[in-house]
């Protein structure tokens, strides 16, 4: 999304700037914008963001304030860094900031404005979100896949148990990613893999591409030049992905006509698409093949890179803090016992486990800058003018580490801070926004929470975990990398010991 280092590119842009600057219209200078860094012509403050933009923006906010104005390329950008400011943008004035900017990756690899995640606010987006919430992600639908989640998790626990017997080192990051991938594909497709195509491979390629910094998203006049070669890659990957999705939809339609529908999400979407137009009238009008494919991509991209990154960081913190790990195990042993494994029905009774999950999401929100919002009209907030089509970035990472909210130990992993607290992760408490809030809050939040809690509880209950190769909790590498999500740079490796 943002550059790691593009010094030559920025030098060239800086040289161009003195020629192009006179023809660029300034922002409405007679209005009072929020304070912020001045930036350079053309590139604005892009060159300052570094490898971890959420950390850079937090540092800048300490200087300029919780509502900060800057230019990223030619895009006027507002950075929100306090719970009070986040509430203004995501609740009080949510109707103004509910849109999304147009991004090249979405245009070429996610059917433009046909899906939900990247679509501008309007009737089409409202209908698609309504369909996803009321048809695909209902509590009943989520509960109907309890057996699938149990089966997939059981398979991975079995493989880790075998590694435990052999005293082998386990790549926990890879194991968790495999669990989430398999659960997601079974939810969507009714199966985890098919030798006739490599959906996992092409989706991983698409997600990697989408997470790369694309100068054309910030300096649009450079788009046609494709100086990074990304446009060509977006188009090529999008075409190959479309071919696979078309094959999958054709197969589901054939199975449905033969009475062999499996009841997965694609079957649900095709069922609505094929209903008479007087049934679910507004929804049936907008659900076509392109929309179905866009929703498929939305669900895969929203599930795979988010839940596994959350679980990876929560397990990392527990291994780094053995006292918290032991406390989790003691609670689960008391509630569940040691004669069976944790089930979803146990989760409401595992209060400390949920505190651990909340603390992990506070310190390591998977999308530290959430999804970018875009203002749909001019507005004044706290005396500051926010121009129409400004890009709004909510620094969820900074919200979760604000010492004014979380006290001076905000950087510490301390699940007990949630003891007796009503602060939750569902978007009502603006100091903790791992899933966003308002109209653009994550519609799959409940499914994501269930999945994260279940996987963490099962792996903690079934195994003791020790660090390999002389690594200790004190020197465990906690370095993160920035993209669509913010996973660990190095995979989490540990030696399991089965305890049930």
Curated annotation (Swiss-Prot):
Its cofactor is heme. GO terms for molecular function: heme binding; iron ion binding; monooxygenase activity; oxidoreductase activity, acting on paired donors, with incorporation or reduction of molecular oxygen. SUPFAM superfamilies: Cytochrome P450 (SSF48264). It is found in: Membrane. Its EC number is 1.14.-.-. Heme binds at residue 442. The chain crosses the membrane at residues 4-24. The keyword Metal-binding applies. It comes from the Eukaryota. It holds the Pfam family p450. It is a single-pass membrane protein. Its main location: membrane. GO terms for cellular component: membrane. Keywords: Heme, Iron, Membrane, Metal-binding, Monooxygenase, Oxidoreductase, Transmembrane, Transmembrane helix. Belongs to the cytochrome P450 family. PANTHER family: CYTOCHROME P450, CYTOCHROME P450 93A3-LIKE. Probable heme-thiolate monooxygenase. This is Cytochrome P450 CYP736A12.
